[in-house]
């Protein structure tokens, strides 16, 4: 969400229509609300946890921007609070796919859709 607003690619008043799914490439990504939420802006997208809103806004922001904010928020890093056995986590994104994962390759819109709702590949 921060990546979408802070980089200026999304305005909170922008409306997205949610029919209950979003198609990216040859894949259909569903919203938890099968009937759809209809028109959603930023606040209603968050309040209703509308997957389609975040798929579309995530694609507008781009996978690189979302990954940048994952790192800014410290995701994938140790907490530094002394947890025994703690290891760093995995940051999912286009740059990480190029450098750190076994599944190196192209980044697709479907990957950004997953990333925009906090889902995606694990190493």
Where do the language-model regions lie?
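Beta-lactam-recognizing serine transpeptidase/beta-lactamase-like catalytic domain environment
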Residues: 2-123
């Amino acid at each position: 969400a921060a990546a979408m607003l802070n980089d200026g690619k999304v305005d909170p008043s922008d409306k997205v229509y949610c029919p209950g799914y979003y198609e990216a490439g040859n894949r259909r990504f569903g919203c938890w609300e099968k009937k759809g939420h209809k028109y959603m802006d930023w606040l209603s997208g968050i309040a209703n946890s509308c997957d389609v809103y975040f798929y579309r806004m995530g694609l507008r922001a781009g996978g690189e921007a979302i990954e940048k904010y994952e790192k800014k928020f410290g995701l994938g890093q140790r907490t530094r609070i002394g947890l025994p056995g703690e290891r760093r986590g995995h940051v999912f994104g286009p740059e990480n796919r190029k450098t750190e994962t076994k599944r190196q390759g192209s980044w697709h819109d479907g990957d950004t859709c997953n990333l925009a709702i906090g889902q995606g590949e694990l190493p």
